[in-house]
A protein has these predicted regions:
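Sec-dependent bacterial lipoprotein signal peptides
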Residues: 1-23
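Ser/Thr/Pro-rich low-complexity tracts
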Residues: 25-118
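Gly/Pro-rich loop segments of beta-rich domains
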Residues: 54, 116-144, 172-189, 217-243, ...
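Residue-level detector of Asp-centered blade-edge/turn motifs that repeat once per structural unit
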Residues: 148-151, 193-196, 247-250, 301-304, ...
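Conserved beta-propeller blade signature
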Residues: 153-155, 198-200, 252-254, 306-308, ...
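Short loop/turn segments immediately following the C-termini of beta-strands
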Residues: 159, 204, 258, 312, ...
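A short loop-to-beta-strand structural motif that recurs across blades of beta-propeller domains
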Residues: 162-166, 172, 207-211, 217, ...
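Blade-level signature of beta-propeller repeat domains, shared across WD40, Kelch, NHL, RCC1
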Residues: 403-429
Length: 429
């Protein structure tokens, strides 16, 4: 009986030792790492629709189980294996990291992907005229200011035709304003929309700012019709060849009062004041009337209410805070074509600018025949054109523009250009 008990005890001890050994092995066992890792991608740049190969480890062989983004923009994964993904560059990706998400774990590329913008012609064929139509069948005469409404339609201040035109996403052109004898226009140079769908027109040679309701009612928001300089309400105010126009989220209208070298502000009630500028041509920063501009052409406003000015003859971009303080946002004042930081970059007669939802600023750098971009980090680059003047669609700098005076950006990041010298509307995506 004692001998049996001793054997049982030995078996129990061996069993317990086995359990302890097994648990020790479990504690020291390191499971394989199946988290995704990007080791490389190629090519390093590309336009929308290009195929990029991402190599690494930990990818899911089921393409749908890998979520890939370029600079935060979702891409389509066409094929997948555990070590390689083939993905399609999404429209408007921009420069930035490539990210892969699998099973809740995200990995980012070490290097940034360089997005190449594609330029196409939305409407017009380079021939001067005033025909409505679709695509190359439409005609413009000195298209300058551009705006995009909430529906995504593009509006063009067709300066030489004394009209404002509408261009749909399909490229169909119709006349929006100016062909009615009750509201004739005289060389309109700017157009903008507010959140309620009201249109505002800088009726340049009539020295007035017009308002058109969604129902088609036209009224004079401000301006007497006589060139001059006066603050006041409605027609008591005066402008001198107003060009650019923009609207903030509160419905305030900002005007590049070009020949007065001032930036004006109009409330929804039609009260006109001077936001910045003393009327003298110069390059002076400071508060309100201390600041000076030289032939400011374009204005844009961001979501925070900051106003950006294409200070044309100064070859710089200015920024005005809501309180009226003016600073030089980009450019060193020398006419040239230099990318880089905002303090070292150079522009040549910039005439128009626009902001997007990510706070990038796009510039029609007119005499450089280039479209430039300024990121929130303060980096200036050419996204299209810039080699020489011409009328060529293509990718990046292989595309050509001619004396572009207008620019606008829609909610999806598509950029539209009033290609003035080519009598056409171009699209960049």
């Amino acid at each position: 009986m004692k001998k049996i008990s001793a054997n049982v005890l030995i078996l129990i001890l061996l069993f317990l030792a086995g359990i302890i050994l097994l648990q020790a092995c479990k504690r020291h066992h390191i499971p394989p790492n199946n988290n995704p890792v990007i080791t490389a991608f190629a090519p390093a740049n590309g336009p929308m629709g290009a195929t990029i190969t991402i190599t690494g480890t930990g990818f899911n062989p089921d393409a749908l189980q890998n979520q890939v983004t370029f600079n935060g923009v979702t891409a389509v994964v066409s094929t997948a294996s555990a070590t390689q993904l083939k993905v399609i560059v999404p429209v408007g990706a921009g420069d930035g990291k490539i990210s892969v998400k699998r099973g809740g774990v995200v990995t980012n590329s070490v290097n940034d992907f360089k997005y190449l913008y594609t330029v196409s012609t939305l409407a017009g064929d380079g021939t001067v005229g005033h025909n409505n139509g679709t695509g190359a069948g439409a005609r413009f005469d000195i298209p300058i200011g551009l705006a995009v409404n909430m529906a995504g339609n593009i509006y063009v201040a067709d300066y030489g035709n004394n009209l404002v035109r509408q261009v749909t996403l399909a490229g169909t052109v119709t006349t929006f304003a100016g062909d009615d004898n009750n509201a004739p226009l005289n060389a309109p140079a700017g157009v903008a929309f507010d959140g309620a769908g009201n249109a505002y027109i800088a009726d340049t040679y009539n020295n007035q700012i017009l308002k058109i309701t969604p129902g088609g009612m036209v009224s004079t928001l401000a301006g007497s019709g006589t060139p001059g300089f006066a603050n006041g309400t409605g027609t008591a105010a005066q402008f001198a060849l107003p060009f650019g126009i923009a609207v903030d989220n509160s419905g305030n209208v900002y005007v590049a009062d070009t020949h007065n070298n001032r930036i004006r502000k109009i409330t929804p009630q039609g009260v006109v004041s001077t936001l910045a500028g003393d009327g003298n041509a110069g390059l002076v920063n400071g508060d309100g009337a201390v600041a000076e501009f030289d032939f400011p052409n374009g204005v844009a406003v961001d979501a925070a209410g900051n106003v950006y000015v294409a200070d044309t003859r100064n070859n710089v971009i200015r920024k005005i805070l809501p309180a009226g303080t003016v600073s030089t946002f980009a450019g060193d004042g020398t006419a040239g074509l230099v990318d880089g930081t905002v303090t070292t970059a150079q522009f040549n007669y910039p005439c128009a600018l626009a902001t997007d939802v990510l706070n990038n600023v796009y510039i029609a750098d007119t005499h450089n025949n280039a479209i430039r971009k300024i990121t929130p980090a303060g980096i200036v680059s050419i996204i299209a054109g810039g080699s020489s003047y011409g009328f060529i669609d293509g990718i990046g700098t292989s595309a050509h523009f001619f004396d572009s005076h207008g620019i606008a950006v829609d909610m999806h990041g598509n950029v539209y250009v009033g290609d003035t010298g080519n009598s056409s509307i171009r699209k960049i995506q």
